Amino acid sequence: VQDGKRFTRAAMDDEMDRPLEILDPLGWLGGDITDKRILCLGAGGGRHGPMLANAGARVTVVDISPEMLRLDQELAEARGLQVETIETSIDDLSMLAEAEYEAVMQPVSTCYVPDIRLAYRELARVMQPGGVYISRHKQPTNLQIDLAPTPAGFVIDTPYYHEGPLSPAKRPGPHREQGTMEFLHRWGDLLGGLCEAGFTIEAVTEPKFGDPSATPGSFEYRGHHLAPYIQLRARRTEKPSATETLWTPASPQ
């Protein structure tokens, strides 16, 4: 927040005037969001919450950082918008009611919680059946390699099955923010945990941040060799009935 870095830049006036074009270029929210109850998991520092409110949504923003929430409130008040802000971790939504939200938008933030499956269970509880969850996550390899390449290329120096918080980044930057504690979540947790929590994954994209002409050692150069994030659209499923079963090849006919 203090440095005004890539992930804490407040929305500019021209962005506030076309919020869905900026935040939802793929149309995953389904168009008009007037009066929709939308939860933002991670404030984005004066960005997602105020922009969605400017598009007509009733917005709640959750973030563990009071400074990030302050940026949201300041921008919302300057625009005459209503944005509810709650200081808590994304894996503790106990203050929110069950099935309260029709949609959830989450910028990159699951890397800051130790148990992503717990965060997904909390998310499932507060979402309405049929609600859409749009999120970005750091993919595992993004947290396994350093920013700068060696003469032989990029080197994986963190085990895939690493447990606990990651060591501080050797070269802090957009791929590893300075002053944060991050956790590596494996694909089985990122995707499998989401399905187990009661979601159906409908779409997966890899936003492009790479530039082959960028200076080696830069975020853009690294992004050309490794997509740093995945973006998901998932649907909160109806609660399954007690009679439903899963057929497997070993099941009796």
Residue ranges and their predicted role:
Residues 132-169:
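Conserved class I S-adenosyl-L-methionine
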Residues 141-145, 174-189:
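Acceptor-substrate binding/catalytic loop of class I
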Residues 181-204:
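Short alpha-helix
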Residues 102-117:
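A short SAM/SAH-binding and catalytic strip from SAM-dependent methyltransferases
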Residues 36-93:
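Class I SAM-dependent methyltransferase SAM/SAH-binding core
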Residues 117-132:
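A short glycine-rich, Lys/Arg-flanked "PGG" loop and its adjoining helix->strand segment in the class I
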Residues 91-104:
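A short acidic, Gly/Pro-enriched loop at the edge of an enzyme's catalytic core
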